[in-house]
Amino acid sequence: MSLLTEVETPIKNEWGCRCNDSSDPLVVAASIIGILHLILWILDRLFFKCIYRFFEHGLKRGPSTEGVPESMREEYRKEQQSAVDADDSHFVSIELE
């Protein structure tokens, strides 16, 4: 019996389940999806720093420079640094006393 589809109702002095043990494919699929969703949510909350740090650094790696002459690599680095320097002006520095 699936915990996700169970309906409990008071019967006399006991708690009983009004649903029958369904082997309906839709109920089975919904149960599996629900359990997987719960597992993924728990893992996300436990390891969110590791997961998002990996994606953040993975996206910032930039294009491969294999086979590119050193002069072009240096030019690319300067362009990237100037873009970063230009973006620094958008941040506000707040100092607390």
From Swiss-Prot:
Cited Gene3D superfamilies: 6.10.250.1640
Segments of skewed composition (Basic and acidic residues): 71-80
All ranges on the Virion surface side of the membrane: 1-22
Molecular function in Gene Ontology: monoatomic ion channel activity; proton transmembrane transporter activity
InterPro entries: Flu_M2
Inhibition and activation profile: The M2 protein from most influenza A strains is inhibited by amantadine and rimantadine, resulting in viral uncoating incapacity. Emergence of amantadine-resistant variants is usually rapid.
Gene Ontology cellular component terms for the protein in this record: host cell plasma membrane; membrane; virion membrane
Keyword tags: Disulfide bond, Glycoprotein, Host cell membrane, Host membrane, Host-virus interaction, Hydrogen ion transport, Inhibition of host autophagy by virus, Ion channel, Ion transport, Lipoprotein, Membrane, Palmitate, Phosphoprotein, Signal-anchor, Transmembrane, Transmembrane helix, Transport, Viral ion channel, Virion
UniProt keyword Disulfide bond, yes or no: yes
Lipid-linked residues (S-palmitoyl cysteine): C50
Region Disordered: start-end pairs: 59-88
GO biological process, one term: symbiont-mediated suppression of host autophagy
Any Pfam family the entry gives: Flu_M2
Record's subunit section: Homotetramer; composed of two disulfide-linked dimers held together by non-covalent interactions. May interact with matrix protein 1.
Main function: Forms a proton-selective ion channel that is necessary for the efficient release of the viral genome during virus entry. After attaching to the cell surface, the virion enters the cell by endocytosis. Acidification of the endosome triggers M2 ion channel activity.
Domain notes: Cytoplasmic tail plays an important role in virion assembly and morphogenesis.
The name this protein goes by in its record: Matrix protein 2
Gene: M
